[in-house]
Swiss-Prot record:
GO cellular component, one term: cytosol
HAMAP family xref list: RimP
Superkingdom of origin: Bacteria
UniProt-annotated location(s): Cytoplasm
GO biological process, one term: translation
PANTHER family xrefs: RIBOSOME MATURATION FACTOR RIMP (PTHR33867:SF1)
UniProt keyword terms in alphabetical order: Cytoplasm, Ribosome biogenesis
Function, in words: Required for maturation of 30S ribosomal subunits.
Species whose genome carries this gene: Crocosphaera subtropica (strain ATCC 51142 / BH68)
Family (UniProt): Belongs to the RimP family.
UniProt cross-references to SUPFAM superfamilies, sorted A to Z: YhbC-like, C-terminal domain, YhbC-like, N-terminal domain
Protein name, entry field: Ribosome maturation factor RimP
Amino acid sequence: MTHPLIPQIIDLATPIVEEMGLDVVEVVFQTNKRPPVLRVDIRNPASDTSLNDCEQVSRALEAVLDETAIMPGAYVLEISSPGISRYLNSERDFIAFKGFEVNIATNPPYKDKKEWRGRLQGRDEKAVYLNRKGRAIAIPCAVITKVQLAD
């Protein structure tokens, strides 16, 4: 379940991050930790996301969060790169990782399989397209529960 502050945080973070030429990939608020952890994953579409990218976003976002006071009490702000085990959600993700190996989970099973692996060829409103050992496979979006970059 998404924390109710996530949309507000995304609205605050997105213009800051985009001004630096970066993308917001995901925002997670871990309230089960003490103090709670607000993690913002960013990506540099032009090159590898650097420590400097994370530091710049951290400073700028921290100032705005403190100024707006939308965060309840003490919290830890973490800015990071999503890494290789990340899930693909947005159209931008599917474009950026075309040709990469992905794992797709389906429920209910599609063609008697719950797990699919192959090279991502694309996505449209109907299906995610994979290349599995030279064979093209279209997995309907309606049965897909997650698409994740393969290890």
